[in-house]
Design a protein with these regions (language model features):
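Active-site adenylate/phosphate-handling loop in enzymes that bind or generate adenylated species
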Residues: 27, 57, 80-160
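ATP-dependent adenylation/pyrophosphate-handling site
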Residues: 4-10, 14-51
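Residue-level detector of anion-binding/catalytic polar loops
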Residues: 4, 60, 112
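A conserved beta-strand->alpha-helix junction
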Residues: 31-32, 36, 44-89, 95, ...
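General beta-strand structural signal in soluble alpha/beta enzymes
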Residues: 8, 63, 114-116
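Phosphate/ATP-binding catalytic cores across multiple sugar-kinase/actin-like superfamilies
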Residues: 1-7, 101-105
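Short, glycine/charged-enriched secondary-structure capping and boundary segments
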Residues: 22-23, 48-50, 77-78, 127-131
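A glycine-rich phosphate-binding loop feature that marks nucleotide/adenosyl-phosphate handling sites
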Residues: 4-16, 69-70, 118-120, 165-168
Length: 168
């Protein structure tokens, strides 16, 4: 592919944690950028866990809150959505906003965007097209969820790199 640097969204979840750790090992920590994009629905520990993971790995990371972007989308869609109840459409706006931000940064700085979906999610259709499924390389695309947890335990075999909260 020709890329020597990568970027990914770091959610504080197991898939992004394992993807980040593998990318840092493969490319070198200085060549992998993580972006934390909390929303009003993010838990405090997911942000702190993602931040701690990047500190443990030593890779650069950014925090870009998406609440204003999400609210702007909802505001613009209000005339179309009207009074219809909240649904998957609104939920997916968060994921697609994150995907757009990551692609913009990847394009600006010449990174490849790493997809963090695993094979279990892909097989069951659990993911958002143009959102968390965005990316030029799916590091975990051939790994079932159980294998992702096994990889996390392997990564942590000598010391805690992936915070314990992510593993439970």
């Amino acid at each position: 592919m020709g890329f020597t640097r990568a970027i990914l969204g770091s959610s504080g979840g197991i898939d992004s944690a394992v993807t980040l750790a593998i990318a840092c090992e493969a490319l070198g920590k200085e060549h992998v950028r993580a972006v934390l994009m909390p929303s009003q629905y993010s838990t405090g520990h997911s942000v702190s866990d993602a931040e701690q993971l990047s500190k443990n790995l030593g890779n650069p990371y950014d925090i870009i809150p998406i609440k204003n972007i999400y609210d702007s989308f909802l505001n613009e869609l209000k005339p179309v959505f009207g009074d219809l109840p909240f649904s998957l459409a609104e939920e997916n706006i968060q994921s697609r906003s994150r995907g757009n931000l990551l692609m913009a940064i990847a394009n600006k700085f010449g990174y490849i965007l790493l997809n963090t979906s695993n094979k279990s999610e892909l097989a069951t259709g659990y993911g958002t097209l143009y959102g968390d499924m965005a990316g030029g390389l799916g590091v975990l695309g051939d790994c079932y969820k159980m294998q992702v947890y096994a990889l996390a335990r392997y990564i942590n075999r000598e010391k805690e790199i992936i915070p314990q909260n992510i593993l439970v």
